[in-house]
Amino acid sequence: MKRILTYDVKDGNDYKKLYDYIETIKGKKLTESTYELDTLLSQKDFESKIKSLFSKNDNVYYISVSDKNNLFYRKIDI
């Protein structure tokens, strides 16, 4: 499932784990802090994975696009 992930870049936060994950799944950078990701993870597993990659209090959102072009939007509480 394609997902658009976006977050606020905060000075002092380390995003290396996120960038490594994006590279591993061959994510596509759209803007400084927005990426297109294609993953087979369920919504729940995707959110869990993303939570593990960010620092507390980061603002993270994603949009999922199904193969039928249905959209799903959610804020991930970190």
Predicted regions and their residues:
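Extended, hydrophobic alpha-helical segments
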Residues: 1-30, 34-43
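Charged interaction segments
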Residues: 47-78
